[in-house]
Amino acid sequence: MIVTIDGVAASGKSSVASGVARALGVPYVSSGLLYRAATLLGQDAGLDLTDQASLLAYLRDHPLRLEPLAEGNRVWQGQRDLTPELHSSAVDQGVSQVAAHPEVRAWVDDQLRALTPPFVAEGRDMGTNVFPHAPAKFYLTASPRVRAERRSRERPEAVEAIEAALIQRDALDTTQSAPAPDARVIDTGPLTLEQVIVAITSQLPSQ
C-alpha cells in the first residue's frame, strides 16, 4: 500500500510521514529532499536556477540517489551525503524555483515511481500527481505563524522572518501544493505530532 501525505511548507510532513511509516513498519519517501538536493547541486555549481535545461543536464550528469528509511531519508550524490546541507536558508530560498520546472518535476516523479511499495510518500503533489491511485491520501496544513514558530525551534532565525518566507513560499507553491479531491485534510496547528500520526493511522484502510 502507498500512503501519501502532502501539505504546505513546514506543516510537519516529514515528521508525520516518518512517524506513520514507523507505526506501519514501512519506509517513508521524502520527495522534497530530491528537490532540495537538486537546488543544492545547482547552487554549488553556480547555475541559474531559473534555467531548466542547464539544471536538468547537470542532474543527469550527477545522478542523485534517494535512500528511503523509516527514521529519515538520505540523499546521495556519488559518495557524498547531501542530507545535512539540505535545510539551509539558501536552499529554502531556491527550492521553489527548482520545483516549478516541469521537466525537473518529471525527473523527480520518475525516481519516486520506480520505488517498490509499501511506503509512505510525503511531498506537495504525491496524492494528486505522483501516486493518484494511492488508497490513502492526507493533506496537512497549519497557519503561517504556527509553522514559523515550529521552524524557529530548528534554526536560529527570527519567527517573523521565517513567517514572511513561508507566506512567500506558499504563494509560489500554490500550483504544486493542493489537496487531492479524495484527501483527508488535517490542521496540525492544535495537534501534537503523536495526535497527527494517530489521526492518520486510525483512518487507514485494512491491509
Swiss-Prot record:
InterPro entries: Cytidylate_kin, Cytidylate_kinase_dom, P-loop_NTPase. One of its GO terms (biological process) is pyrimidine nucleotide metabolic process. It comes from the Bacteria. GO terms for molecular function: ATP binding; CMP kinase activity; dCMP kinase activity. Keywords: ATP-binding, Cytoplasm, Kinase, Nucleotide-binding, Transferase. The keyword Nucleotide-binding applies. It catalyses: CMP + ATP = CDP + ADP; dCMP + ATP = dCDP + ADP. Its EC number is 2.7.4.25. It is found in: Cytoplasm. It is an enzyme of class 2 (transferase). It holds the Pfam family Cytidylate_kin. ATP binds at residues 7-15. GO terms for cellular component: cytoplasm. Belongs to the cytidylate kinase family. Type 1 subfamily. This is Cytidylate kinase. It comes from Deinococcus deserti (strain DSM 17065 / CIP 109153 / LMG 22923 / VCD115). The gene is cmk.
